[in-house]
């Protein structure tokens, strides 16, 4: 059993307003569960515009610490961009699998958001009525369908997927600096000096950024 987890937050720094999960058992999506959560900070206008969860909707809801035990009980937790959910959630007693990292490994060069992959891979999944993209349970169904597709295509076991998740992977776009939002491959072609400057001057960098810069500097 693999448990797909999704959170909606007050912003990029965290503050959970909703958590949901579904389980994938024998290729089927089962056991849906979701909770609205009282956050530890105000919801940013930008986040509210995306998930449409308001302060009034969560004002009387339980804290995440009171809700999270409902989501224990799996050896494997799965999320799309799992590093984010893992960072904002309390410690979960299991191994993590990231479908975004798996998709990057399996299908290089395509867009990796869960909805982009849903469309590109032509996934067929029945989402919950009354919900929409960027509600936690809705996104769990999309990620679960993606996970099933990844497993059917690759033949990877949970152990292999967790191993891939734990390794650095190439970044596809810059998330900072003057080329924020631009494809790394395009920047490497147009301005390789910028990559060289980053590699030589950043005091600290993530393993993914180091791997990406080294890859493009050695191959362009």
UniProtKB/Swiss-Prot annotation:
One of its GO terms (molecular function) is 3'-5' exonuclease activity. GO terms for cellular component: cytosol. GO terms for biological process: DNA replication proofreading; mismatch repair. Disulfide bonds: none annotated. Keywords: DNA damage, DNA repair, Exonuclease, Hydrolase, Magnesium, Nuclease. Coiled coil: none annotated. The keyword Coiled coil does not apply. Capable of degrading both single-strand and double-strand DNA with 3' to 5' polarity. Has higher affinity for ssDNA ends than for dsDNA. This is Exodeoxyribonuclease 10. The lineage of its organism: Bacteria, Pseudomonadati, Pseudomonadota, Gammaproteobacteria, Enterobacterales.
């Amino acid at each position: 059993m693999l448990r797909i987890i999704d959170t909606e937050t007050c912003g990029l720094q965290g503050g959970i307003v909703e958590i949901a999960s579904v389980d994938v058992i024998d290729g089927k999506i089962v056991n849906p569960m979701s909770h609205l959560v009282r956050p530890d900070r105000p919801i940013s206008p930008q986040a509210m515009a995306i998930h449409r969860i308001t302060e009034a909707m969560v004002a009387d809801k339980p804290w995440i610490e009171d809700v999270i035990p409902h989501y224990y009980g799996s050896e494997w937790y799965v999320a799309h961009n799992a590093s984010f959910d893992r960072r904002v959630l309390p410690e979960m007693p299991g191994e993590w699998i990231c479908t975004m990292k798996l998709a990057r490994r399996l299908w290089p060069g395509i867009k990796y958001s869960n909805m982009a992959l849903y469309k590109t891979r032509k996934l067929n999944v029945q989402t919950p009525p009354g919900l929409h993209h960027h509600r936690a349970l809705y996104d769990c169904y999309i990620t679960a369908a993606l996970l099933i597709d990844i497993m059917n295509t690759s033949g990877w076991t949970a152990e292999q997927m967790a191993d891939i998740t734990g390794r650095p992977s190439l970044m596809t776009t810059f998330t900072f600096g003057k080329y924020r939002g631009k494809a790394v491959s395009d920047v490497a072609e147009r301005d390789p000096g910028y990559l060289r400057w980053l590699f030589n001057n950043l005091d600290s960098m993530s393993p993914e950024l180091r791997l990406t810069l080294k890859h493009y500097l050695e191959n362009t």
